[in-house]
Regions:
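Ribonuclease/tRNase effector modules and their secretory precursors
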Residues: 1-95
């Protein structure tokens, strides 16, 4: 299981606005996720964008590795453009 961390205030905001608590990231299917480093800006630390399933729904996660954990910055349901990109991107699958 992946260890996660997050800012409690940001988690509360995400839960209220999107109905998604950051704790759900523990259920993300990392084996089939699409992950890319976000190099658009100088964030001061490495930042990654992930498209992966939680339950039967594709989600978009932004995180930074911090203190040996996945530090969650953002979690939301993937939009239609992201669903299409996920479907069209070859992934290394184990099944």
């Amino acid at each position: 299981m992946v260890k996660i961390g997050f800012d409690p205030a940001k988690n509360a905001t995400n839960r209220a606005s999107r109905g998604l608590p950051f704790e759900l990231v523990e259920q993300l299917d990392w084996a089939h996720a699409l992950m890319e480093e976000d190099t658009r800006k100088a964030y001061g630390e490495r930042r990654f964008q992930v498209l992966g399933f939680i339950g039967g729904r594709l989600h978009a996660l932004v995180f930074t590795p911090r203190e040996g954990k996945v530090h969650v910055i953002s979690l939301r349901k993937a939009n239609s453009r992201e669903v299409k990109r996920y479907a069209e991107t070859p992934k290394s699958r184990t099944d």
